[in-house]
Amino acid sequence: MQEAARRASLRKEHTPTNEKFGDLSKQDSLGERASSKLTLDDELYDILYAFGETDAFINKGDKQRETDEDGNPLTRQALLERIRQKKEVIGKLRCQAWSMTRKRRTLKLAQKYLEQHESKVSRSHLYMEEMRKRARLMKRSFSNFKTYLIPWESKIKRIESHFGSVVSSYFTFLRWIVFVNIMITLIALVFVVLPETLADSVANEGRFNRTKTRKQIPANERVHADELAVVWHYDGYLRYSPLFYGYYSDDPFLGNKIKYALPLAYFMVTLTIFAYSFFAILRKMAANARMSKLSGSKAEQYIFNWKLFTGWDYTIGNSETASNTVMAVVIKLRESIADIKKDAHGKFRLLQFSLRVFANIIICAMLGFSIYCIIFAVQKSQVQDDGNLFTKNQVPSVVSTITHVFPMIFDLIGKMENYHPRTALRAHLGRVLILYTVNYITLIFALFEKMTALRDRVNSTSTSSSHRTKRQQGGWNPNMQRPPPYASRAEVRQMSDFLAANTRRFQTVSQRTTRSVTTPFTVAPQFGPFNVNNPNAVFHNGTHSTSFESQILGPKALPIFTPPPRKYPGFTPGNVGQQFGGPDFPRNQVYTKSTPLPRVRTKPPWVYTTTHPPLVQNRAMTTTMSKSAKKGNSKNLDDDILLSNETIQMSEAALRRNHDGHNNDICWETIIGQEIVKLVTMDLIFTILSILVIDLFRGLWIKYCSSWWCWDIETTFPEYGEFKVAENVLHIINNQGMIWLGLFFAPLLPAINNIKLIILMYIRGWAVMTCNVPAREIFRASRSSNFYLGILLIWLLLCTLPVGFVIASMSPSRSCGPFARYQHFYTVVTREIEKRVDQTVLSYIRHIASPGVVIPIILFLILIIYFLFSLVRGLREANTDLQAQLVHERTEEKKKIFELAGGKKNKFEKDRDKKRSNDYIPLIEQRRREPWRQYHEMEADHALASDSSEESDINEDEDDERQPLTAYPLRAIETPPETLQVTAFHPSLGSLIENREMEDEESASGDQLPMIHKSVSFQGPSHMQMRQSISTESCSQISRSAIQVATPEEIRALLRPYLEAKYGIPYQHGIKSFPIDVHTPPNNTPSRRSSKYNSFVSLYEHTRDDHKNFVASTIKETDEDPGKSDKKQTSSKDVAPDFMPWPSADEARALREKMKSKTPLMLTKTTVEEKPKGGKSSESEFRPPVPIHRKYNIQTTEEENEEEETDSAPESSKKRFRISVSPTKTIAPASASRAQHKIVSQASSSSSIPHGRQPDPNKKASLVLPPLRAPRVQFDEDDSPRQID
């Protein structure tokens, strides 16, 4: 209250005494506004007016503003408050719905006030305000500068100006994916890669020896590590890099002082990345949901308005794109019109149905073919040293080809289906999405099958600890004194199969072994490990060891030769135990005798060369002879060393072709990581190739060949390449799914993906601006942004399933990765929990984690989810119902407002009201309202007009002689002609009260009254009925009485007995609403609307008939010969009104002031009495048909007749009157003996006499009507009328 009083005082202070009328109206409006509760806009509005709106006003009111309402100078607090108000005005100015001129003027005034008064508070305060101002400017400048730091913002804006916001949404989505991958990469780098690298940089000798096999490439692989095929396979140096799983050590802790658990960190980082991805996607979807407009229901209500007024893209800055957008809007409008006109059930077409079935069969066959190709490629993929590029990379090549080629084939197949363009687009997107999903699932299953085979192979070679130690050392640890060159990791069975399948024996005529008497032993020409140069063979009398592996070592292979026969010293025959040798030698051989051979002495080495055509590759073998072991009864052999070169022929199948030889052990996690990284890389290459071939080369061909080609290739086929936003977004989603899938096996895969996405950003942007055109059918990003994010969320869920299966079910590799020490991947978490949690609590946790508790919890969560879905569905339905209710109420309120304002109803509303009113109209009333009656019913139907008992007393002979009733035109008045505004009935008592009076300004002649310039609606009989002659013996009396107010409830109470008796059911509803009426055309003909003609509710439609331009006509009875009674009389003045000039402004102002004057009305009843005449008097009578429940009898008394005689004496004392009928009162006749003819007055929408019934001005007036008057009443607080004397 104090604030309101202060504002009021400010208004008084700043209001000059010599203000003009407009300024006073402003201050009056402000005073009215101050009395109510002000909103923020009102406060700002008052502040602006309180401090003035012009510079002159500010200069003149400075002295007054420096004082408060008491005249005292303003205190510092008050001045600060005013300064705060001004700052609030400046801060909220941008949000005001004002014109720009007013905003600038207000800003200027507020700033000027602050400049003048801020220094008066205190200098320190002024400095603080200046600092705040500078800080705001810096903040704003920094916010503007940040826009330049957003990556690719200018490129995206340029694309948006040429192609619109739909195409730019793809690049915005791509940029968001890049940001997400950058965050994932930072998480992996900080918590996994960086600790491992730091630990290696300060590693001691023990850690170096433990991790050397994982982090350093072996010497045999270093030779080929820089070859293109090895690098393309992500092998060589890349395999032993932090890119893959196998690089990381399995030490429980890193560092001595700061113990960092890398296995636990690796596990938790994987979970954190998936959680962050979920959070980022859901947060983006929520932001889009908040920013989106809930225009679904609105678009359904106003289809064409939304498409027309919101279909334009204001970001377009290119003329060609603008013309394309115009055509797109036109096409959408045509499609909407076609959809509206299209029948619900289209005609069945057999050919079209057959084509659609055939197209779906082809698409399903292509999906099956893609599944077969992926499975076949995964199963047959091998890492080879030779072969073409496709055989080395079958899996990524096949998957990328299917991803890029099949969607284009789907698009071509979809054209034969002849769907609606919008339906065809959605079907194509659905098929592409199904293709990506099927390929993804197939690839996962194929990789898991391959992984299972690799794990089984690893498990078969790790049956004992000795085998595991030998496999881990692999023969290449220089710190160990062993092993010999033939140390093997292979299994005995595998080695035997390998040798049996890949070894060819020499065919010689002589014996294969030669025994010399002088030598203690015999050396076979074929023995020892394969492919070893300069062999040193040792014959042992011990157990044969068959576990070995061949290695590719040393320089180039030596040529094939056959050693010359030699003689050896004799020896005693006996058993010779073999430690090693080829499969051609049995374990124990007994030589009974020796066959002497010719001895040839040569100096070693002996080199002989022979040629074998089927040989594929040469291998050199070195054999070393050492001390022999002693076994059983075998005799000791002499120590000797034999140097010889032997060559063994190997078939093509014996060449090393699998990946087992590239590493000392099989690390299946790294192998899967390599496959996924190759998929991502191959997808980038295929994307670049598709852009070059499909977009660039096609664009060049069309540009330079369209002028001379045999058909129009620019507009028909192949056209310029379209940038398909939806397909490209699905491609990005598929690529991101691969990243999430391979994240566990390759921690730095998101970094590679960032490089790929950046390349895509630039090459796609270049292709769009150079080669592409906007697509004809647009899948709008504004409506489908959450659709894309929803697909991305589903893809993330699909990626978490296989990774979760690996973590929960698979056993890690024993020789690589951070989980090599554990039985399962999740064991690292369980062990940490066991270390840090009490056993009692741990037992409870185990019980809770048991299936007996987890399964019910899962079921309970499913029920909760179902309940929430049901709740959301119910709320959505309730929201729909509320929207429908709001729309209905809005429509009804609009209709009421238009009715109150005199608006018209449209055809639909009229028909609806007509249908509603039929439920409450009696049958006799419906017959009376038939449209043909106003044209063809020559005489009033007594059966339909009235059922009054007094009508039977009327003399029927009076109908023989009739006289037409005519009405004189109205007298001209000094008011401008204007159209009468028709208002609907409003159920209040004030609608029946007349508030205006009009002075009698009849001319001295009084013969002719010109027609008024108004369009008045009159529900009455037709012209033919108006001109029917009536009997001259009958007389017509018009009774005038004061208006009696009747509420709608009273009218319903009067109608209820009749309706219950008529229909036999209790009447429940009254008159729901009174229909409005429309004004007639300029010819002033009565309304012919059947629903309003002779309607019983028309009384309330026009409750104010004494408008300022309206004067009731006077009905005069004329003496006419009986012979002339049937003759129709017309007057030119009845057809068209006389010309009346518009009144001047002074006349209109005087008339308005005269209308505002308040004059008490006559409350006495006046009647019109017919003057006595000799003989038969001819009267004009009209009997419109009236329903039973709306008929009123108007009668007069002798006192009224006498009063009429006194009122009609002088011409100057004649006053106009209005025929007003009370809907609930019937006046009984005063004298029954007197012959009277009653006029059954009908409740019409206007009480004025229609122009069709205007009397002939040439006839003598026999009836003089009193002036139009009505009692003046006022209303109390209970809405009850009270008459004013």
From Swiss-Prot:
Expressed in the ASH polymodal avoidance neurons. Also expressed in other sensory neurons, including the ADF, ASE, ADL, AQR, PQR, URX and PHA cells. Residues 203-260, 382-388, 456-667, 746-748, 810-852 are extracellular. Glycans are attached at N209. GO terms for molecular function: mechanosensitive monoatomic ion channel activity; monoatomic ion channel activity; sodium channel activity. The chain crosses the membrane at residues 165-202, 261-292, 350-381, 389-416, 421-455, 668-705, 725-745, 749-771, 786-809, 853-886. The keyword Cell membrane applies. Pfam families: TMC (PF07810). Pore-forming subunit of the mechanotransducer (MET) non-selective cation channel complex. The MET complex is composed of symmetric dimeric MET channels, each channel comprising two copies of pore-forming ion-conducting transmembrane TMC subunits and auxiliary proteins including the transmembrane inner ear protein/tmie, the calcium-binding protein/calm-1 and arrestin domain protein arrd-6. Sodium ions are the most permeable, whereas calcium and potassium have lower indices. Sodium-sensor ion channel that acts specifically in salt taste chemosensation. Belongs to the TMC family. Contains ten transmembrane domains with putative domains TM4-TM8 that line the channel pore. This is Transmembrane channel-like protein 1. The lineage of its organism: Eukaryota, Metazoa, Ecdysozoa, Nematoda, Chromadorea.
